[in-house]
């Protein structure tokens, strides 16, 4: 598949896409022995691409782990045939090929992990993985006893589900802020739970997953995980 050179270089882990554009401007990239220009494309399957004379194929793959604070309005896919904004666009400059670990629906926001570490992805999304996911959910509707009703659910719209841990953090005149901890990754699970309990979700934000917490990472921004955070994810212990 033919792609822009800066995208190929970034995915190979050499540098960010913007830095790759600078390499092209400086004449440090070649394709099949010929100096490449910014705007050129190539096919990794057919062409020999080199940076500073060293073939990309000869470089070991770089494994990165990225935490994104996904904004509302972005779908959790690598590309979208409907032309919608994707979360992958926001981490395109991370310097390596990555995939989202699990999903957040378009109108949800918060912590979303990206990596190309297949073993870790499988661990975190496997139904038997017992991975806790913590959400802050603003709701309105039948507020009295809402936390208790949600905690008591054992099926969601006819589908068996594990018990969630729910507590009320704040109550306003017309809405309430709940903390919801679930242990599964079923499609739109919390929204379906709330609907079943007579609640409308106004905002849904994932603030923690497994050993990771969102912290003060700004909406739309991403950061690399630290070595300690990666180790904790793999071992299942707090960093």
List PLM regions with ranges:
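Basic, flexible Lys/Arg- and Gly-enriched helix-loop patches that mediate nucleic-acid binding at interfaces
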Residues: 2-239
């Amino acid at each position: 598949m033919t792609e822009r050179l800066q995208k190929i270089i970034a995915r190979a882990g050499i540098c960010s896409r913007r830095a790759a554009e600078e390499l092209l401007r400086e004449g440090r990239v070649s394709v099949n022995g010929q100096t490449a220009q910014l705007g050129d494309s190539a096919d990794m399957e057919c062409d020999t691409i080199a940076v500073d004379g060293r073939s990309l194929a000869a470089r070991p793959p770089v494994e990165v782990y990225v935490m994104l604070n996904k904004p509302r309005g972005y779908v959790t896919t690598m590309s979208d045939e409907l032309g919608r904004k994707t979360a992958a666009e926001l981490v395109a400059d991370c310097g390596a090929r990555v995939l989202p670990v699990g999903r957040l629906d378009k109108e949800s926001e918060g912590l979303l992990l990206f990596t190309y570490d297949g073993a870790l992805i499988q661990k975190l999304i496997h139904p038997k993985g017992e991975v806790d996911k913590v959400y802050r959910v603003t709701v309105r509707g039948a507020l009295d006893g809402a936390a208790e009703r949600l905690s008591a659910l054992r099926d969601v719209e006819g589908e068996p589900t594990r018990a969630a841990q729910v507590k009320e953090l704040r109550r306003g005149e017309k809405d309430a802020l709940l903390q919801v901890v679930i242990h599964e990754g079923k499609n739109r699970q919390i929204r379906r739970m709330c609907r079943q309990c007579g609640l409308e979700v106004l905002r849904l934000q994932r603030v923690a997953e497994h050993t990771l917490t969102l912290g003060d990472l700004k909406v739309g921004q991403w950061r690399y995980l630290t070595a300690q955070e990666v180790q904790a994810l793999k071992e299942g212990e707090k960093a």
